[in-house]
Amino acid sequence: MKRMIALDGAQGEGGGQILRSALSLSMITGQPFTITSIRAGRAKPGLLRQHLTAVKAAAEICRATVEGAELGSQRLVFRLGTVRGGEYRFAIGSAGSCTLVLQTVLPALWFADGPSRVEVSGGTDNPSAPPADFIRRVLEPLLAKIGIHQQTTLLRHGFYPAGGGVVATEVSPVASFNTLQLGERGNIVQMRGEVLLAGVPRHVAEREIATLAGSFSLHEQNIHNLPRDQGPGNTVSLEVESENITERFFVVGEKRVSAEVVAAQLVKEVKRYLASPAVVGEYLADQLVLPMALAGAGEFTVAHPSCHLLTNIAVVERFLPVRFGLIETDGVTRVSIE
């Protein structure tokens, strides 16, 4: 019998990342775990619908036995069975992030007995989670270089607070892992600005695009009007395609915040990324830790290691026989497998 790993949910960023990473790693390694003080660092601690959906999804995919799987629970015990590929559908029942649920269960399906398809309904444009286009256009091309083949499709948008969005991912078992080396970003090839609107006047998007174009030379400017029943909502994105990597940044519009202010927030974030020689942005760095650890090698550079990144590394090192090294040089942090 494999040993039970005990985790403190209050460590590091004190949010849902510890739980999601633990679920992924438990499903992959077969090691059971207990986590206490779940989301202790949040204003509303314990499991929310999004986290509970991730737990139930993980349990269904690997036939696990779970204690504490209920709303508001701050303690969870997870003992898994066998991971099985197949077709799965999960509903969050709120505007909680679809992509964070997918992020939890997809790594286990890289090791399943056959191809799988996972569909999640809930929120798609959430300021606290990567949108589907980030997964599709930024993360998945890098996963393919590592040897992980999955394809994410956004079937319907769902903005906060209504939700109602649908995201699906098809994934195949991994044959072998490759090493990902992201040492240099390379020259910028092109930049693309994009605005999504649902139930919001078009002039809002036009002003947001104008703000982006006032700071960057955009090769593409796209405005997408979504059906009104998918909103109300507004998301502004800017994609930076460089020779060795594509990064994508986004901001979700808010009521009573002007289009110019919303877009200016995005401009500031992109300028901060471009001012640093670091290859990956803060959010992408979080996503690369687990696949890199499974490959057993690799490296990337990031401007500053976020609390999310450090927490993710700490959890990975509890489950896998790997050690990460973080070395700061010339204003960036090099993250690698030691």
Curated annotation (Swiss-Prot):
GO cellular component terms, alphabetically, are: cytoplasm
Q: Which residues cross the membrane?
A: none
Reactions the enzyme catalyzes: a 3'-end 3'-phospho-ribonucleotide-RNA + ATP = a 3'-end 2',3'-cyclophospho-ribonucleotide-RNA + AMP + diphosphate
Family per record: Belongs to the RNA 3'-terminal cyclase family. Type 1 subfamily.
Q: Which Gene3D superfamilies match?
A: RNA 3'-terminal phosphate cyclase domain (3.65.10.20), RNA 3'-terminal phosphate cyclase, insert domain (3.30.360.20)
Which InterPro entries does the protein's record reference?
A: RNA3'-term_phos_cycl_insert (IPR013791), RNA3'_phos_cyclase_dom (IPR023797), RNA3'_phos_cyclase_dom_sf (IPR037136), RNA3'_term_phos_cyc (IPR000228), RNA3'_term_phos_cyc_type_1 (IPR017770), RNA3'_term_phos_cycl-like_CS (IPR020719), RNA3'P_cycl/enolpyr_Trfase_a/b (IPR013792), RPTC_insert (IPR036553)
Which GO molecular function entries does the Swiss-Prot or TrEMBL record give? ATP binding; RNA-3'-phosphate cyclase activity
Gene Ontology process terms (BP): RNA processing
Q: What is its EC number?
A: 6.5.1.4
Write out the annotated subcellular location: Cytoplasm
- What is the stated purpose of this protein? Catalyzes the conversion of 3'-phosphate to a 2',3'-cyclic phosphodiester at the end of RNA. The mechanism of action of the enzyme occurs in 3 steps: (A) adenylation of the enzyme by ATP; (B) transfer of adenylate to an RNA-N3'P to produce RNA-N3'PP5'A; (C) and attack of the adjacent 2'-hydroxyl on the 3'-phosphorus in the diester linkage to produce the cyclic end product. The biological role of this enzyme is unknown but it is likely to function in some aspects of cellular RNA processing.
Keyword annotations of the record: ATP-binding, Cytoplasm, Ligase, Nucleotide-binding
Official protein name in the record: RNA 3'-terminal phosphate cyclase
| Residues bound to ATP | Q103, Y283, L284, A285, D286, Q287
Decide whether keyword RNA-binding is in the record.
Answer: no
Residue positions of the active site: H308 (tele-amp-histidine intermediate)
